[in-house]
Amino acid sequence: MAIKVGINGYGRIGRNILRALYEGKHGGAIKIVAINDLGDANTNAHLTRYDTVHGRFHGDVHVDGDSMVVNGDRIRVVAQRDPTKLPWAELGVDFVLECTGLFTSKAKASAHIAAGAKKVLISAPGGDDVDATIVYGVNHGVLKSSHSVVSNASCTTNCLVPLVKVLHEKIGILAGVMNTVHSYTNDQVLTDVYHSDLRRARSATMSMIPTKTGAAAAVGLVMPELKGKIDGFSIRVPTINVSFVDFTFTAARKTTVDEINGAIKAAAGGALKGILAYNDQPLVSVDFNHDPASSTYDATLTKVIEGTLVKVCSWYDNEWGFSNRMLDTLLAWSKAA
């Protein structure tokens, strides 16, 4: 029997999760039965059909009353600000995909459980109280059926951690700094407006904007042995999608470009296939749009200085890759003991 899912928040990630479900491999195992979003059903249906970044949805989408019908599947659309009043119990929802960016702690996300859902998967870094922070492909084995609220980390953490896992296991990482060159998102502004972060107050369309990110520090939540050893920052850039992780670290022993590239290539074709991909072509960001991998390593950019100072780089579709991992984590959790 398919897992019944409700999506709370039908923005960039919520919509891409739905599209990824219908375009991908989990269609028979997962069934979206409801969407909670403050937009009306007609607008949400239109935004499902047509997408500036990912193109037209090649399926049938129409509205019937208070429902959006996708390829014959009826999905109820509600607009409720208070998650405790959502119809999860009535609809028999097993899992809620919390995609608003607002209910990121266990305390807040548990409002969905009060409304009748069994479990909540947060599409953002979670608070200290969540049961687990998961990067699928690296630590999804820690999921337990007893968990009620889990974080799927961030798109950037999902790009970085698979690289870190391979490099730490094969070579050893003493300490590292990450920079993500990140496409702008809708929490930025089109024109200059007031913001407590003076750089974030500036137009996303005109500048490269340095800002903070918790993605690097979150590595320690997934790989506790590296807690406190990796930090980083972000530079938001005027592109609409696809981002880039630039990770520099001190290796525990001497290594070479060939060894590092070989280790990543082996993992991308083996244990991390589908999560970590390998590229040796001179590509640019648009070439990775709509790529479902969490992380596509760019072997052309690897640098090693004096054997122990190492730089590696990886591309990621910060929308599509992460949305696919939400589905992967959901399915893995549903099967956990």
Label the model's feature ranges:
Residues 1-201, 328, 332-336:
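N-terminal Rossmann-like NAD(P) cofactor-binding subdomain of oxidoreductases
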Residues 170-234, 240:
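Catalytic core of tubulin tyrosine ligase-like
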Residues 22-26, 165-173, 183-186, 213, ...:
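Generic secondary-structure signature for well-ordered alpha-helical cores
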Residues 142-144, 200, 237-243, 304-307:
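Short, flexible turn/loop "capping" segments at secondary-structure junctions
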Residues 146-147, 203-205, 242-246, 309-311:
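Short, solvent-exposed beta-strand edge segments and adjacent coil->beta transition regions
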Residues 38-41, 126-127, 154-156, 180-187, ...:
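Glycine-rich beta-alpha junction loops
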Residues 232, 244-337:
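C-terminal active-site/capping subdomain that shapes the small-molecule cofactor and substrate pocket
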